[in-house]
């Protein structure tokens, strides 16, 4: 029997842990699969995905900066992908790509089950309004948060995200320069890529955003998360959490969509933490 082909698309993508995660899931469940990382710039993504499908690709994950492009080329969409306006999981069915988004489910599962957080009643600051932010915002609302304030370098994108979520009573956008006037939050989520240059000054956020319960969460992991988590610790946030757990949980959701079985995530998460010093330092 030929081995099924899967991949993660991004730009850049060489750093991705997804191939290792899905290889571990395959061993755990006894499912033979070939999962690789494919670097595709936005203008090359459609052609790269077509080649992948022609070569027998059955499913794909999509990371920055391609999630909104994946949304646009999906022949059909899950409800959560439609609300998010972004796709991180593609399933090949009847010669077409079906788009889904497992990011939000992965984040909520990591925060509530791995870290034991109760999201109900929390006031949330969401930094960013791109594909990553769009992926997690609907799931946070479903988890019972009280209010979400979206702040983005481009106010128009923040407004567009708020409009797409369709809950004006709970979701508002604010300007970056207004951060000092926003009050404090129980959850601060960094959904930007500002930490990629590892500049600690990129997250010189006001200390007034933090209260005694604040959990600061970076959707990135590894070196990219270090600057934001350093700020979180200096601000004495109760929790400083990187995106590794979310990555593993969203991968498990994708795996279940493709194979019909949800793998155990704790062994994979623990193994990744144990083997990589950068990941440990970003925890």
Swiss-Prot record:
Shikimate binds at residues 16-18, 63, 88, 103. Gene3D superfamilies: Leucine Dehydrogenase, chain A, domain 1 (3.40.50.10860), NAD(P)-binding Rossmann-like Domain (3.40.50.720). SUPFAM superfamilies: Aminoacid dehydrogenase-like, N-terminal domain, NAD(P)-binding Rossmann-fold domains. Keywords: Amino-acid biosynthesis, Aromatic amino acid biosynthesis, NADP, Oxidoreductase. The active site is at residue 67. Pathway: Metabolic intermediate biosynthesis; chorismate biosynthesis; chorismate from D-erythrose 4-phosphate and phosphoenolpyruvate: step 4/7. One of its GO terms (molecular function) is NADP binding. GO terms for biological process: amino acid biosynthetic process; aromatic amino acid family biosynthetic process; chorismate biosynthetic process; shikimate metabolic process. Coiled coil: none annotated. NADP(+) binds at residues 79, 128-132, 223, 243. PANTHER family: BIFUNCTIONAL 3-DEHYDROQUINATE DEHYDRATASE_SHIKIMATE DEHYDROGENASE, CHLOROPLASTIC, SHIKIMATE DEHYDROGENASE. Belongs to the shikimate dehydrogenase family. NCBIfam families: aroE (TIGR00507), PRK00258.1-2 (NF001310). This is Shikimate dehydrogenase (NADP(+)). It comes from Xanthomonas campestris pv. campestris (strain ATCC 33913 / DSM 3586 / NCPPB 528 / LMG 568 / P 25).
């Amino acid at each position: 029997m030929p081995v099924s082909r899967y991949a993660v698309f991004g730009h850049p993508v060489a750093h991705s842990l997804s191939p290792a995660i899905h290889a571990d899931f395959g061993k755990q469940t006894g499912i033979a699969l070939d999962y690789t990382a494919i670097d595709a710039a936005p203008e090359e993504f459609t052609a790269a995905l077509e080649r992948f499908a022609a070569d027998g690709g059955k499913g794909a994950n999509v990371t920055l900066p391609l999630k909104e492009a994946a949304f646009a080329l999906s022949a059909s969409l899950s409800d959560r992908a439609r609300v998010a306006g972004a796709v991180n999981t593609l399933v090949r069915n009847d010669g077409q790509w079906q788009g889904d988004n497992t990011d939000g489910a992965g984040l909520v599962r990591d925060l509530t089950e791995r870290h034991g957080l109760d999201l109900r009643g929390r006031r949330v600051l969401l930094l960013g309004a791109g594909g990553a932010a769009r992926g997690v915002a609907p799931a946070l609302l479903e988890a019972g948060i009280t209010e979400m304030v979206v702040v983005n370098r481009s106010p128009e994108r923040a407004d567009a995200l708020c409009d797409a979520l369709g809950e004006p009573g709970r979701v508002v956008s604010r300007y970056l320069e207004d951060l000092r006037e926003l009050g404090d939050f129980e959850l601060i989520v960094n959904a930007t890529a500002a930490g990629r240059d590892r500049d600690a000054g990129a997250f010189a956020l006001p200390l007034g955003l933090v209260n005694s319960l604040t959990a600061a969460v970076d959707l990135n992991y590894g070196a990219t998360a270090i600057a934001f988590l350093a700020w979180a610790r200096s601000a004495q946030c109760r929790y400083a959490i990187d995106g590794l757990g979310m990555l593993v949980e969203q991968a498990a959701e994708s795996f279940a969509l493709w194979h019909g079985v949800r793998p155990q995530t704790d062994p994979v998460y623990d193994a990744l933490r144990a083997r990589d010093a950068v990941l440990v330092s970003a925890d």
